[in-house]
Structure formats: C-alpha cells, structure tokens
Amino acid sequence: MTTDVTVKSLAAEIQTPVDRLVQQFADAGINKSETDSVTQHEKEALLAHLNREHGSAPGKLTLQRKTRSTLNIPSTGGKSKSVQIEVRKKRTYVNRDTPEAQQAEAAEQAQREAEEQAQRAAEELAKREAEAKRAAEEQAKREAAEIAKRNSAEKEKVTNQHTDEMTKPAQAEKARREAEAAELKRKAEEEVRRKVEEDAKRVAEEARRMAEEKGEEWAAAEKASAAVETADYHVTTSQHARAAEDENDAKVEGERRTRTRGGKATKQKKGNKLSESKADREEARAVTRGGKGKRKPSTLQQGFNKPAQVVNRDVVIGETITVAELANKMAVKGSQVIKAMMKLGAMATINQVIDQETAQLVAEEMGHKVILRRENELEEALMSDRDTGAAAEPRAPVVTIMGHVDHGKTSLLDYIRSTKVAAGEAGGITQHIGAYHVETDNGMITFLDTPGHAAFTSMRARGAQATDIVVLVVAADDGVMPQTIEAIQHAKAAQVPLVVAVNKIDKPEADPDRVKQELSQYGVMPEEWGGEAQFVHVSAKAGTGIDELLNAILLQSEVLELKAVRSGMASGVVIESFLDKGRGPVATVLVQEGTLNKGDIVLCGFEYGRVRAMRDELGREVTSAGPSIPVEILGLSSVPAAGDEATVVRDEKKAREVALYRQGKFREVKLARQQKSKLENMFANMTDGEVSELNIVLKSDVQGSCEAICESLLKLSTDEVKVKIVGSGVGGITETDATLAAASNAIILGFNVRADASARRVIEAESLDLRYYSVIYNLIDEVKQAMSGMLAPEYKQQIIGLAAVRDVFKSPKFGAIAGCMVTEGNIKRHNPIRVLRDNVVIYEGELESLRRFKDDVNEVRNGMECGIGVKNYNDVRVGDMIEVFEIIEIQRTIA
C-alpha cells in the first residue's frame, strides 16, 4: 500500500511553492492545508484539473521560414526594375501516435472522465445527504418546539391534578411525538437518498454517453488524419517557392538515401521518380527503419488556396518583347509560352526576341487580353512639348550639286563662292558633303556639294533628301555617266526638281545636244523639248553662264514657294559629323525650321547635348542660325550618324531618356534581325566555315566617309573571301583600336587620320599591318589586292607534248615499253600523262621511264623517237597516243 504524502512534501517533490499548490488544490475543489495528506486519487484529480486548465502537450509544431530574392521586371523606357520578393514558408509537423495507442488513450481518457464524473456525483451525493440530514434535524427541532409550546399551554389549563395521574399520559404522548419525528426524518432521508441516486445514475449515464461520443470523434479524427496523409498540401505562393520546396525535398531525399545507421548503409528500393507524387515521397520518408513507429509527413500549408481557374490578365506588349518577359507578364512559366508558340508553328527559345504580332497571338491564345503599346510615347510627348512659331516666312532654297566624278561640281561651286575648296580635297575629288550659303544679288542660296565617286551613294541620297533643288552637273564632253544616272534616280526618289548645268561648254569637243539626247532617255526633258527641266550651259573655268544658273535656281525656288517658320525651336538634319581631337564630337547641321541658338538642348538620333559652340562654314563663331543655314555644332554626347534628324527640345533629362531608348531599340531590332533564321540562308550558313575572312579596323575623319568606305569594302566580298569590318568609327587611331585589331587579327586602315603614340606602340609590339590613305581609290585597290592573296589559286592543265605509239616492247624491269614518235611539242620525264585510244582517254598516270637509244633522258623534242614506260600500266597498244601535260598555277584576282 502506498504511503500518502503531505501537501508540503508533494510541493518539494514537484519543486513548486506550497502556497501555489494549496491554491491549485482549492481551484480543483479540494481543500487542503500544508500538513494534510494527499491521496493518489486527489493527485489524479489535481492533474486532471491542471490539464484542463493549461491544456495538454502541443500536438503539432509549426516552423516558419522566410527567403528573400530579387526579381528584375522590365518597365517602360527599356529599363528593368528590381523587385524584392519575400517567400514565406510554413511547415507544420503534427504529432500523431499509432491507432492502437490512440484507442488506448481514448479508452483511458473516457475511463478517467467517467471516474471524475462518478467522483463528482459521489461528492454531490454526500453534500446532499448532509443537507438532508441537517434539514431533518431542523424540522425535528421545530416540531419539538411546537409540541413543547402546546404542552406548556395544556399544563397551564390543567392544575391541581395529581402527579401520578399525569405522568403516564405525558410519557405516552412523548413517545408518540418522538415516533412521529423519527418517521418524518426517515421519509426526508429516503427522499434525499432517492434524489441523489437518480442524480448519480443520470451523471453516470451522461459520462458513459460522452465516452462513447468521444470514441466516435477520435475514430473520425483518425480517419481524417489518414485522409490528410494522402492529401497534397504542396501549395506555394509562386513558382519560386515551389522550386525552392522541390529543391529542399530533393536534398532531404538524397540525405535519407545516403544516411547510415550502425555503420551499415541503408538501401532503398529503386523506383520511378517521375511517377512518385509529393505525398508518396513524404510517406516513404516518414516510415522509420525498424517499422516501430511513424514520423508523420510535414505538410506545407499556405494562407490561400490554389486558384481553381486561370486568371485572365491585361498584358501590355511593346513592339518587341522576349519570350521570358511575355511569360513574366502572363505569370506563367516560360515553357508554357514556348509550347503555345510551337502549337502556333513558331519555334523560339526563352531569350529570343519576338515581334508584337507574334506575342499578341500567343497571349490571346492563352486567354489573356492584349494591350498594344506604342514604344515612342515618350518621344512623341517630348516632341509635342516644343515651342514652334506660327508664321511661315519665305526662306532660301537648299541646292544640292550632283553629278559624275570629275564633271566639275566643286569647281562650279568654287566659282560661285569665289574660293578654292577643291585644292584642299585629297586627289582633287570631294569626299565630304560641303555645305555653304552664298549671298547673291537676287537673294541667298544654300549649296550642298556631294561626292560624285561611286562609293558615296548613301551620302548623295542624304543630300537629295535634305534639298529643295538638285543641280545636275553634266560635262558636255563626257555625257551621261553612271553617277549621273544615279543622281537622277535620287532626285526622282526625293521628288526634287532638277536644273541641269551642262558644264565644260568651253571645250572644243563639247556636245550639249548629245547631253540633252542622253538625258531625255532617263526622263529628264528640256523645256524647249516640252519638258520641265531647265538646261543651262556653263563653264566653271571661264565663268560663263553662272548668272543664268543662279537665276534658274531662284526662279525654280519661287515656283516652289519655299517657306519656313523662323521663330521657335529649331529642327534640322545632320549633314556630316566627325570627331575632332580638340573639340570633341562635331556635327554639321542644316537648319530647316526655327532658329538654332547657342545653349539649346539638341537631340540627334542616338545622341543629345547642349550646343556649346556654333560655327559657320568659314569657321566663324555664330550665336544663332535660321532656316537653310548650315552650321557646325559642338557639345553632343557622341558623334551622331549622318542623316539623323536634329531637334531642339526643352528638357535635357527627357532628351537623354529618348536617346537611351533609341539606342536600346536599335539594339533590340538588330538582335531580332540577327536571330531570325531563314530557310534560304541555311545552306549558305553551313558553308560559312570554309570562307576566308579579311578582318579590318577602319577609322575615318568624318562619318560620311567611314560609311561610304564600309559599304564599298563590304561589296568586295565574294563567295570565297569575305570582308569583315570588326571596328569602325571617326577620329584618330587609338590604343583601343590597335588592341581590337590584335585580338581579331585585323589590318588597320586610316582614312585621313593618324595613330597616336600609344596606338603605335601596340602596333609595333604586335606587328600589325597599319596603312594610311587619303584617296578612296587607293584604299579600295589595296584591299582588293589583299583579298586576292587570300583567294585559293586556280590550277590549269597545259598540254606540252604528244607522242604516237609505233611499237610495243617488253622490259623485265618496266613491263610494256611503248616505242613512240614525238609528233607535237616536247616529252618530259616525271610529268603526268594520258593514254588516248581513238581520241578517248583510257588511262591517266605518270611517265615513269623515258629513253632514247637505251639512254635515260629527261626530255625528247618534236620529231624524235623514244621509248616511254607508263607507271603501273601495261596495256599499251600500237596506234595509241600518249599526251604529256603539266599543271600551271594561276594567281586569281578580284575584279
């Protein structure tokens, strides 16, 4: 039998204050003091109360983890925005015991609750019995008091009677009253006992019913937990969280496979990982080695449920977009977008740039609404915020002088300007666009002098685009030439009227009528023949007809009614640009509208900047320039491309954004063009590995010359040798250019530029090929020679002799020997030969033995007899012809 402990010893045993333990006993309904003993039953009652009060041990453990990452999201303007992503993962481990332990625990819990109910019922019964007993005693006391009161009244009424006579009835009455009180007490006690028993039965019945209900609830909970085990709570907030969880699962799975117990590696059954679900893997991981228990799988529960249907989004698509960006906007994986494109018949990679139409088809196919965005919204907003004047005033005509090379364009313009510009051009040919404005008696005229060389096609096209009138210079002694025809085509494409200047009219061999006849074949009809073109006979040397030419130009400009807004922000076109060593990027701009002032913010194509200085064509500083005035401006961020539109804007920050956007847009379009694979180019690309390449680094003094040279060099490419310009630009040859040439094994060509000291050191150290040119003819000719050296040589067979077989002899050393007569040319030893029978080649081999009168000889001439031994051939017959030839290597050139 267990010895009962006191409250004080129990407090010391469980290490808690005595006052707190007494208070806990009181809260449990057990009144105890420090010295009172505690039974086992009271301990259990206290424990049950504490469990109810504080709850049992936690049945689950929840772990939370946060991971942070950065995602780049494309935004307007070509920039990407970094977004911080926080993935919150919550994993709950539920502590579930085995079904047998749960059932035993359930039964024990039910029994414990029933005992507690019975104990509470017994306590209630004892309390009620005490109350009934107390009530019965009080009732008996009241009745006894009433009887005593009645007896005293009777004693007062009955007097003077003998004591003996009254004693017997009083005793009998007292016995009767006591019997009545006992009967009443017994009835009250029975009533109380009956009520207590009924309450005890009812409480026991409720306890039994509650135990049964608890058992059913636990059984249902067990079934629910089994269902939970098979459920997949693999719900994640995003594809990043899902990838992180799968990676973690794979790591845990690998650790479980390689984990050892007792020094012996545990082996797992190989299975098809592709067919396993997430719940299967967790359940397999939960089973312990000995099979004695389970560690229940952890379930990841998020704060929201997986969407049941696809969310349709508004997808904003620009002119170009990559597959990854499109998938990001639709919140799907890139593989799904690629699958959708494959269904539509388009093959793409995740980083490939696709156009707007393809992206729209894919997005609509996947059920999203497409919003097409114009990429130049920022540009349009910047251009609309310009202060332009309202009143248009007459302006000077912009005249472009065009024609064939050496037909006298620059000389004609020199006479008009009374300067000697042609002497400054290398080789006497124009290699830049010269922009000049001259004051005449009848008004101002702006002239653009374009190169006539074949290489400057694009430069001439730019001149025609920026002009109002084209003066076509044709030499009277030379007639219509290829560049003359090209100039006519440029003028027609730009829809610009032509004024024909028939130059060199003072030469004796001049024939103006032939010029008119030839030009009429190309649609340029003189006015006297019913056409629209004015023909003026001029001589740039003698100065004849110059005034008539100027009057014809001004007359044509009056017909055109040329007007421009003089006030407000300026706009124009870049005629030429170059990099000056002391001044930086310099651009020649022809103002077309408004007034360009010093300090204005100019946007030129990909470049922008504030105008720091302006100069006219004579090099004089100016502060403003109106319409039709060409000026050189300084202060741009870099060298703009010739032909770019120059516009004055208000905000330098917005100008910078537009320039950067244009650069990014140009790069995207370039990449999209490169990645577009065409079927017709497939076989050409397959043979690219066999083609030799001539790598060139080209530096020029101005942008136009650089562009023209690049175009001419690329046209020299053939099927066997290709010209590859690895680097080009304006300005001097720098160390960077030399390093690039060394890395790409290229030659360096400088056109009117020189290499600096650091570049020369690199060129000498790397033994690079550096060449300087000032005339484009020489540059192209030398590149042709270099390409010719890279061509594979051509081999040609030349017949040097012919011999007729007259007889055949047998030799033990050489086999069949043909006795021959040389009929043509010479027969040489060790040369390749052909054996002809009836003029048909039957064998081709090598002449092994050549003898004359038993002597070995190296050569036998025409008309002499000899013996010929053919190597590895014995079927020589009388009447055959032996043809001796040699292979000649012919050096090829590029035409």
Curated annotation (Swiss-Prot):
Pfam families: EF-G_D2, GTP_EFTU, GTP_EFTU_D2, IF-2, IF2_assoc, IF2_N
Binding annotation for GTP: 403-410, 449-453, 503-506
Record field: compositional bias (Polar residues): 69-83
Domain tr-type G: 394-563
Bias kind Low complexity: ranges: 100-109
Annotated PROSITE patterns: G_TR_2, IF2
GO molecular function: GTP binding; GTPase activity; guanosine tetraphosphate binding; translation initiation factor activity
Residue segments, region G2: 428-432
Superkingdom in the source lineage: Bacteria
Cellular localization per UniProt: Cytoplasm
Compositional bias annotation for Basic and acidic residues: 110-217, 242-257, 273-286
Positions of the UniProt region annotated as G4: 503-506
GO CC terms of this entry: cytosol
Record flagged with keyword GTP-binding: yes
Region annotation G5: where it falls in the sequence: 539-541
Entry annotated with the keyword Cytoplasm: yes
Keyword tags: Cytoplasm, GTP-binding, Initiation factor, Nucleotide-binding, Protein biosynthesis
Function: One of the essential components for the initiation of protein synthesis. Protects formylmethionyl-tRNA from spontaneous hydrolysis and promotes its binding to the 30S ribosomal subunits. Also involved in the hydrolysis of GTP during the formation of the 70S ribosomal complex.
Family per record: Belongs to the TRAFAC class translation factor GTPase superfamily. Classic translation factor GTPase family. IF-2 subfamily.
PANTHER family recorded: TR-TYPE G DOMAIN-CONTAINING PROTEIN, TRANSLATION INITIATION FACTOR IF-2-RELATED
Protein name: Translation initiation factor IF-2
Species annotation: Serratia proteamaculans (strain 568)
